[in-house]
Amino acid sequence: MDHIYICRFFSIPNTIKTKNKSHTCPDLSGAGSFFIPFGSNLPKPESINFLRGYGIWGAIDRLGIPKFLQKDLNSSTGFLIAHGEVLPREENSVSLSKRTDKWGIPIPHIEFKWSENELNMAKHMESTIRDSIEAADGDIRGIDELIKIPYVGLFTEKSIALSGNPPPPGYYIHEVGGAAMGFNEEESVVNKLNQLWRCSNVLVLDGACWPTSSWQSPTLTMMAISRRACLNIKKT
């Protein structure tokens, strides 16, 4: 699994009345951005035609674009990136290919595509992003409309990440679920404490052990799962 996502850049009327925004705007980071969880001001549940949810990461004037490259000094530049949960499906799988690498080891063969559920979610993401930007008196813009870089349009117009459709699986590099945990050996690779069923001293601690992608960014959850597994080793 990987997160399905939609990314949009935008401009809004200047939010900070100062000659030097760098004094008040930190660099893009966890503290210099915001996150909108799924669930706020939703319409009635029956109008949602997909399972699970998504969140929206964004920031305004945190991209560090030098003033001389900005096309409109009277506006602020921002972005919104929605990423959502992908449901585990038997059709999405990893197996060994007949092809081998230069050491003669079979390479992974990955079967993975978005389902109707994810594509419906992506449409809802797009609608929510547009509504959010409009509510802030903003306009969705292409990169070439925001910054002055020669020929940037030649690259962005073919960018998969900035296209109207969600990029293919693997593009967001939040891959998880290749060795999922579960309740028994027949349906999973590791147990609830991340141990291989037949070799308890081998642990899978990265995103491979996840039975679902959830919609949050995976790093902190990976750290928490790793800590729990290590505490269990210490205890036993």
Predicted regions and their residues:
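FAD cofactor-binding and catalytic pocket of flavoenzymes
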Residues: 1-120, 164, 169-175, 197, ...
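A glycine-rich dinucleotide-binding beta-alpha-beta segment and adjacent secondary-structure elements
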Residues: 75-81, 124-213, 219
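Generic, well-ordered alpha-helical scaffold segments in large soluble proteins
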Residues: 99, 125-136, 229-236
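Glycine-rich loop(s) and the adjacent beta-strand/alpha-helix scaffold that form part
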Residues: 1-15, 206, 221, 225, ...
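Generic structural signal for well-ordered, non-membrane alpha-helical segments
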Residues: 5, 118-122, 126, 219-222
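Glycine-rich loops and low-complexity Gly/Arg-rich segments
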Residues: 104-109, 119-122, 135-137, 205-207, ...
